[in-house]
C-alpha cells in the first residue's frame, strides 16, 4: 500500500507537474527476482522504465548487487553505489558500534570493498550506464575519491562540510 502511494506521487510529479527529470532510485534490491517484481509492480502502477524518459536507478549496496551487477543492470539504468552499506555488509560489521569495538575496522578502502565497488563501476561502464556513489567514504578519504574518479565513476555525493577538504 505504501509503495503504491509512492508510485502515485512519483507519477503525479512526472506527469501532472511535468518534472520528467525526476528519476526513481530503488534501494536494497536483494535478488534478481526482487528486481523483476519491483519493476513489474511499478509498471502496473503506471511507471514504466523508458516511458516519458523514466530512468530507474538501483542502489548498489549489497555484495550480491556487485556480484550479479550485469544481471541487475538488465533491469535498471544504472547504479548509485551505497558505500556505507556495501562496506558494512561486505566486511560484516556495523560502523555505528563504537570505535573501540568493530567500527574501527570500517573502511571503504578495504580491498574487499574496493573489489565490490570496482566490479559495480566496471559493469555500468561496460553497459554505458550511469554509475554514481553516495556515502561517507569520498567525504572522509580524498584518496578514495581520487580512486573513484580514476575508475570512471560518473558522480560522487559529498557531505557539504567536506567539499573544501576534498577539493
Task: List where the protein language model places each region.
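Conserved alpha/beta-domain cores
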Residues: 1-167
Amino acid at each position: 500500500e505504501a509503495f503504491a502511494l509512492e508510485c502515485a506521487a512519483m507519477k503525479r510529479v512526472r506527469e501532472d507537474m511535468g518534472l520528467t527529470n525526476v528519476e526513481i532510485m530503488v534501494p536494497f534490491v536483494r535478488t534478481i527476482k526482487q528486481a523483476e517484481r519491483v519493476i513489474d509492480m511499478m509498471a502496473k502502477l503506471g511507471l514504466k522504465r523508458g516511458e516519458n524518459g523514466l530512468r530507474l536507478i538501483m542502489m548498489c549496496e549489497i555484495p550480491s548487487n556487485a556480484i550479479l551487477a550485469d544481471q541487475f543492470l538488465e533491469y535498471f539504468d544504472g547504479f548509485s553505489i551505497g558505500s556505507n552499506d556495501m562496506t558494512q555488509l561486505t566486511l560484516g560489521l556495523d560502523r555505528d558500534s563504537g570505535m573501540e569495538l568493530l567500527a574501527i575496522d570500517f573502511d571503504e578502502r578495504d580491498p574487499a570493498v574496493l573489489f565490490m565497488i570496482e566490479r559495480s563501476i566496471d559493469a555500468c561502464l561496460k553497459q554505458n550506464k550511469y554509475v554514481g556513489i553516495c556515502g561517507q567514504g569520498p567525504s572522509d578519504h580524498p584518496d578514495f575519491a581520487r580512486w573513484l574518479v580514476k575508475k570512471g565513476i560518473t558522480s560522487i555525493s559529498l557531505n557539504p562540510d567536506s567539499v573544501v577538504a576534498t577539493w
